Amino acid sequence: PAEEVAALIRERGGKAVVDTHNVAEWAGAKAMVDKAVSEFGGLDILVNNAGILRDRMLINMTEDEWDSVVKVHMKGTFAPMHHAGNYWRAQQKAGKKVDARIINTTSHSGLFCNIGQANYAAAKAGIASLSLVAARELSRYGVTVNAIAPRAETRMTQGLRELTPEQVERRDPAWISALVTWLASPEGAKISGKVFEAWGYGYAVAESWQHGPITPASKDPSELGPRVEEIIRFSRKNAGIDRDTWLDI
């Protein structure tokens, strides 16, 4: 598929190269960044979208199923960001103006929970938090960082469930790529540290964890029952954690 996409870009007058290094490997991620700089004379935009699924209930999940998913998603996002960030820092220190973008891929599973995806959800939640940290750290170098939680039908999700024609249309990746393109454009220069939900029904900002009700602390566990019950009673339910509240998309 990568070769097909590159060929299509060339047919339409663009320039494209394919790199087959493993972005979940430290040296592979660096080689990819170095190749982009070498082929195009610089690096302006990094979109992290590597992912795999190894779905299984937590108590049945194997160590390899956990490790492989977390490595591809988490390290496969962190490693390219690390090497790209070092490139942009060096550019800035050399006196060059940097106006760069990083767009990461998180998931509704990571933001709102999904049974049977402990490995995937943990990795995607980590990517969301990683994106917020990176947005703060890399802003000094002229880099914006955002993340997108897409709902799209891709090679990774085909066959997981039957979809109506309307759902297929609403899961067209074109809805997602439009937002990615906008965030990567000059218009997106002031947007950083945000996590977006994106699908054919619309775009939304996923609001992060907030401080909820508070109660006085105690070193005596016997005093905590009523206090914890009170703050739970006045707290909001974790957003979207009950799948019955999700849009049927």
Give the label of every model feature segment.
Residues 15, 42-45, 128, 135-150, ...:
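Conserved Rossmann-fold SDR core element
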Residues 20-31, 63:
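The beta1-alpha1 cofactor-binding region of Rossmann-like NAD(H)/NADP(H)-dependent oxidoreductases
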Residues 147, 166-249:
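C-terminal helical subdomain
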